[in-house]
Amino acid sequence: MTTMSTTATDTAAPTGRRQARPLALTYAGLDLKRQLRDRMGMFFTVALPAFLFFVFGIGDDEAYGSANVAMYVMVSMAAYGAVTATTTVAGAAATEQTMGWGRQVALTPLPSLAFVAIKTAVAMIVAALPIALIYAIGAATGSSGNAFDWLASAAIVWLGSAVFAVYGLAVCLVFKGENAAGIASGLIVIMSFLGNLFTPMDGIILEIGRFTPLYGYAGLARYPISEGYLPNDAGHDPVWLLLANVCAWTVIFAALAVWGLRRRRERV
């Protein structure tokens, strides 16, 4: 009897994994299509950052570091679009879990880790869209820099946006209901101003901004161009300061996400 039950367990596990693989691919494809068909979401994630680049950066060929001002603005707007994308997708995933979709997923052979991996992959794919569009517009309209500037800044913008997937998850786990995603996106706009993404800051506002979540990420994305020097002779940010900002906020967001998840589980 023991041998039969052990054999059944051993054969069930591989079968479950085999079922989970095509299910994971199917779910990932469906989720990506759903994100791309969300016209309002795509507007704020892709079209709005591109429009802001048209307004603030196109055609400004004044030299800035190893590039020009147009490229500096291009990187900033791509960063804004990327973090908006990862925040939106991750926030939606957290909301789905709290609204009961998590129970439906739990009934399928799809493991929790696979669900998280799918949502992360979809978030990063969506984040690549505003980066690709804005960089293409920049290349066609006079943004100039060397090959390293283009490749390094794009890579940092894309990879660094993953931090804000954790942020979106944290906010939507801490706050209740469908409005949580709106709160997360609204805070991104405020943090973008303080993070020197929309307009160069100076004085006390700049000093406050150095401690906000987007400051380190944006500074690192523009570091290949600026080497840490700020516009309007507002000072210099060493790379260790920018890295410390990103690491500190990553830990804070992760801690908030864990706390929010535990609190919700305790209420169930």
Question: Could you describe each region identified by the protein language model?
Answer:
Residues 2-18:
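Short, contiguous pre-domain boundary segments
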Residues 2-6, 22-26, 197-235, 239-240:
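Short hydrophobic, aromatic-rich alpha-helical segments embedded in or entering the lipid bilayer
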Residues 16-19, 23, 27-99, 119, ...:
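Transmembrane helix-boundary elements of multi-pass transport/secretion proteins
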Residues 55-63, 172-215:
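Transmembrane helix segments
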Residues 56-59, 93, 102-105, 137, ...:
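Hydrophobic alpha-helical interface/terminus motif in multipass membrane transporters
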Residues 84-89, 162-169, 194-201, 219-225:
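Juxtamembrane membrane-interface segments at transmembrane alpha-helix termini
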Residues 104-112:
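Short helix-to-coil transition segments within interhelical loops
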Residues 112, 116-182, 189, 239-243, ...:
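Alpha-helical transmembrane segments and their short interhelical loops
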